[in-house]
Amino acid sequence: MKGKHKIVVKNNRLHYEFEIKRNITIIKGDSATGKTTLINMIRQFANLGNASGIEIECDATCTVLEGNMWQMLLKNLSGNIIFIDEENQFIRQQEFAELVKVSDNYFVIITRENLYNLPYSV
C-alpha cells in the first residue's frame, strides 16, 4: 500500500476526518480528546457494519488490532489501515516492530509513549 489515504469516521454526533501519508502514524494527545473514541467507533463498525450507526469512508479497509491473537491477525491482514490503542502492550515488543516493518498495511497507533523501535511520524 502506497500513497495518501483519507479517512472519515462519523456518526450522528462525532466526525473525524484526517489523511495519513506514511505507513506508521502515531496519534498523541491529552486525555479525553477522543482518541480512544475513534478506535471504539472503528471497532463497532467492524463488528456491526451499518447497524452500528457509524460510517467509514476510506479507500482501504480500516480495522482494529487488539488482543492476544494479534500476531496471527496481523500476519493475515494485507492492504488495511490498522488502528491500535495504547492499552495493547504488544506495541512495545520487538516482535511487533519486526512484523510492522515487513507488512504492507498502514498503522495508526494511539499512544503517549515513544516507540523507539518503530520509524514513525507524529
Describe the residue ranges of each PLM region:
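P-loop (Walker A) phosphate-binding loop of NTP-binding proteins
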Residues: 30
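Conserved P-loop NTPase "ATPase switch" module shared by AAA+ and STAND
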Residues: 70-94
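Post-Walker A helix-loop "phosphate-sensing" segment adjacent to the P-loop in P-loop NTPases
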Residues: 44-55
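Conserved glycine(s) of the Walker
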Residues: 33-35
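Hydrophobic anchor at the beta1->P-loop junction of P-loop NTPases
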Residues: 27
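Sensor-1/coupling segment of RecA-like P-loop NTPase cores
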Residues: 99-122
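Post-Walker A alpha-helix
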Residues: 38-40
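N-terminal pre-Walker A segment at the start of P-loop NTPase domains
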Residues: 1-16
